[in-house]
Amino acid sequence: MNMFSSLMLASLSVLTLPIMSSILNTHKNSTYPHHVKNIISYAFITSLVPTMMFIHSGQETIISNWHWMTIQTLKLSLSFKLDYFSMIFVPVALFVTWSIMEFSLWYMHSDPYITRFFKYLLTFLITMMILVTANNLFQLFIGWEGVGIMSFLLIGWWYGRTDANTAALQAILYNRIGDIGFIMAMAWFLFNTNTWDLQQIFMLDPNLTNLPLLGLLLAATGKSAQFGLHPWLPSAMEGPTPVSALLHSSTMVVAGVFLLIRFHPLMENNKTIQSLTLCLGAITTLFTAICALTQNDIKKIIAFSTSSQLGLMIVTIGINQPYLAFLHICTHAFFKAMLFMCSGSIIHSLNDEQDIRKMGGLFNAMPFTTTSLIIGSLALTGMPFLTGFYSKDLIIETANTSYTNAWALLMTLIATSLTAVYSTRIIFFALLGQPRFLPLTTINENNPFLINSIKRLLIGSIFAGFFISNNIYPTTIPEMTMPIYMKLTALTVTILGFTLALELSLITHNLKLEHPTNMFKFSNLLGYYPTIMHRLPPLANLSMSQKSASLLLDSIWLENILPKSISQFQMKTSILISTQKGQIKLYFLSFLITLTLSMLLFNLHE
Amino acid sequence: MSLAHINIFLAFTVSLVGLLMYRSHLMSSLLCLEGMMLSLFVMATMVVLNTHFTLASMMPIILLVFAACERALGLSLLVMVSNTYGVDHVQNLNLLQC
């Protein structure tokens, strides 16, 4: 009798302890944030044990705890699915969250509501764990909505700022549109497979799964910011940097991809949906990489980088490689969170300056942050044998050697090289050159919280890929043999991107600033997508509904059709055809004479 | 024709001439129009009663009703003209405006 299920449940339930303590009002004291951070580190260590047991034995578990209700033939219960995906994701997520909590002890140090902040982050983590370990769609939906709500509360943390409120509302609205797809999928599964349990759905293996998979794809588009529902992710950078690091890089936005990965037994039989996901992911990754090229806010560039990597994950699902996508989720969490934390360190040191045109020369002033930023960027672009290499290179290789859409593949490769371009841009503007910030600096990165948290993620960014890849059991076999030019494709385009970006930056650094070209404006304004879609459809909708509701019935049918139209018609025609001048007496007199004459004529004719 | 008939007929003709030939006021032609209606009414009643044509005894009543409507219409036109100009002189009606 091993302690697999007990330890996993213990690890998940210790996370809820600090929330319970708010009932006892112990959360008002100032050590509450440290308390939360320690709880998460304990949960992480506790969850390592079941994970290592799982790696050793390959034993998957389903824990069905509590039967909630039965509605006619649908049985709803609290069940946790501890399989490959959730067992590996939970320690990774807990590790990253531990580092982010420690980072936010430094970052949010001067915030008066820091305990509330930590409570929100913890609630977010709990709902994310619910999402990841859910065995039925209902529990998954609870986690799904939970992360959406916490995202709203955390993006709008500084609610005095209008932009933050707008961004939080935008996140909710775009996620809601995705939720329509989710609910449609739930309804379809309820009707056709009579259940919301994943096991029964996969066992029944329904034939025509186009509709539910389209619904799940829409849900993933909304939650993971794919093209069409993507503008909320760059706007979500209005929240504090720990929020961006946790939610919008590692954990929440991968929920959509995670959903599609969960349903991979259904997706591998449906070629149409695979092509759709492939094209959607390819468009997303290229579009957001283009948008990232000319942004000036460091957090927005990293947000677009996240969006581009999410598109890459969706592409991986589209070529029927869910395990590779999952590996990329896990490795991406490390270096993306670290990139955000480094940008947070830079921002705080430069007194809340987020514009990269006003940074520079930090290479010597902040060595530790510089190191981790460069290593994070190298890991992101897939530098051989760092973390990103183990997932990203495998993805590109598999895409190259599989029977897939050449256009999608080309877009993915271009986006890979653009990844290197904008990473170089960040490094060049923020770290190299002469300082462009104000002389009175407050650059200080000597806080142990900051250093320890970034150091942990740094070690993770370097070694986690190797560590995870060597310890998971074999799933889909990657392609082992390919021509050498295909093997080196990812590396080549990345080095090409680096070189190009560096050369361009160095050459144009001292040139005169020109008027922005059309391409520049397209990239800077996010492809005009938010400008058009946030103004035109709401205006059209609202004006159409106003016209049909008030104008159509009242003023047209009741007023205009008969009464006013008749009066106007009469007036117009009478003006048109009247030739009289109002000489009434003349008309009457002529009438009388005619009458008299005709009577005389007819009477005296005999 | 008998003398009564000629009398009524003459009344009708006088009113007709008065309707068609008037000097300046629109009211006078409206009055003559009423006179025409009245003489027609009397003529119709006399004929119906003399020939005992009972079935047609509705006709004068209906004629009166329609005369009332027409009276109202004529008076409303008069009021419109009078609203614009203050007096109902016919020479004012040379501007056909809508």
Curated annotation (Swiss-Prot), chain B:
Enzyme class: translocase
GO terms for biological process, alphabetical: ATP synthesis coupled electron transport
Main location: mitochondrion
Bilayer disposition of the protein: Multi-pass membrane protein
Molecular function terms, GO-annotated: NADH dehydrogenase (ubiquinone) activity
InterPro entries to which the protein is assigned, alphabetical: NADH_UbQ_OxRdtase_chain4L/K, NUOK/Mnh_C1-like
Statement: the UniProt record of this protein carries the keyword NAD: yes
EC number: 7.1.1.2
UniProt entry tagged with the keyword ATP-binding: no
Chain segments annotated as transmembrane: 1-21, 25-45, 59-81
GO cellular component, one term: respiratory chain complex I
Localization: Mitochondrion inner membrane
Catalytic activity: a ubiquinone + NADH + 5 H(+)(in) = a ubiquinol + NAD(+) + 4 H(+)(out)
Assembly information from the UniProt record: Core subunit of respiratory chain NADH dehydrogenase (Complex I) which is composed of 45 different subunits.
Name by which UniProt lists this protein: NADH-ubiquinone oxidoreductase chain 4L
Organism: Equus asinus
Gene: MT-ND4L
